[in-house]
């Protein structure tokens, strides 16, 4: 790996904002090899694109998919990220919950402990809540 890649590089490249940094980020992504993209940075990038740039969910998902597929970028588990994006986009969960669903699906656990009833929209995992006393 040549370097871990930070959210600000991805956001500049994806948004073109501000233009000078965006050009530098895009050139860097095109010229480097084996940049490691970790899941936490993906989550933060989703948050920034949604909150600051008010990008629609479909655009955010497409942008992250393009980063996962980018030639110079390496992900620890690209299939997990892609499934997280699918759940995020189609089941309309926050990215963190979508990521938990994808983790539960790819393990033998199959359950997510959460008060967030939106997880119930995904029929591949079971949501459990802490019991009332």
Name every feature range the model reports, one short phrase each.
Residues 12-14, 48, 122:
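Residues that scaffold the ATP/ADP-binding catalytic core of kinase and kinase-like folds
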Residues 72-113:
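Active-site neighborhoods of divalent-metal-dependent phosphate/nucleic-acid chemistry enzymes
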Residues 6, 44, 97, 116:
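Acidic active-site catalytic centers that drive phospho-/nucleotidyl reactions
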Residues 1-37, 52-59, 131-133:
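Short, well-structured N-terminal submotif of metal-dependent ribonuclease cores
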Residues 1, 101-133:
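Acidic, PIN/NYN-like endoribonuclease modules and their adjacent C-terminal/linker elements
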Residues 46, 50-53, 57-66:
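Active-site-proximal, substrate-binding regions of enzyme catalytic domains
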Residues 39-47:
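Short, conserved active-site loops that position catalytic residues or coordinate cofactors/metal ions
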């Amino acid at each position: 790996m040549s370097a871990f890649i930070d959210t600000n590089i991805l956001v500049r490249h994806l948004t073109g904002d501000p233009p000078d940094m965006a050009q530098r980020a895009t050139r860097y992504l095109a010229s480097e090899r084996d940049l490691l993209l970790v899941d936490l940075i993906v989550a933060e990038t989703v948050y920034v694109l949604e909150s600051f740039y008010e990008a629609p969910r479909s655009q955010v998902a497409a942008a992250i998919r393009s980063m996962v597929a980018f030639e110079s970028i390496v992900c620890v588990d690209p299939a997990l990220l892609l499934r997280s994006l699918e759940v995020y986009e189609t089941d309309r969960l926050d990215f963190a919950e979508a990521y938990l669903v994808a983790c539960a699906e790819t393990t033998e656990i199959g359950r997510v402990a959460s008060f967030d009833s939106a997880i119930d929209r995904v029929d591949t995992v079971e949501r459990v809540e802490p019991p009332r006393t």
